[in-house]
């Protein structure tokens, strides 16, 4: 028989928000395809959505300043 799989752990969504007084600020970028409830992962040179696979590349600041 195959080994039993453990329970999946979920991320704490409260870590993705910053609350100051009555204002709430999102700390991570939201996916434009999935909507406001899905956050994108930030990698070295891109943002990626784990749900739909949408990817946005960051602009390279060095090449823009050299031109």
UniProtKB/Swiss-Prot annotation:
InterPro entries: Ribosomal_eS31, Ribosomal_eS31_arc, Ribosomal_zn-bd. A zinc finger (C4-type) spans 31-52. One of its GO terms (cellular component) is ribosome. GO terms for molecular function: structural constituent of ribosome; zinc ion binding. Its cofactor is Zn(2+). GO terms for biological process: translation. Zn(2+) binds at residues 31, 34, 49, 52. It comes from the Archaea. The keyword Transmembrane helix does not apply. Part of the 30S ribosomal subunit. NCBIfam families: PRK00432.1. This is Small ribosomal subunit protein eS31. It comes from Methanococcus maripaludis (strain C7 / ATCC BAA-1331).
């Amino acid at each position: 028989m195959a080994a039993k799989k453990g329970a999946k752990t979920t991320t704490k969504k409260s870590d993705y928000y910053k609350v100051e007084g009555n204002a709430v600020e999102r700390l991570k970028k939201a996916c434009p395809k999935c909507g406001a409830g899905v956050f994108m992962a930030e990698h070295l040179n891109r943002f990626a959505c784990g749900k739909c696979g949408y990817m946005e590349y960051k602009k390279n600041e060095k090449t823009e300043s050299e031109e």
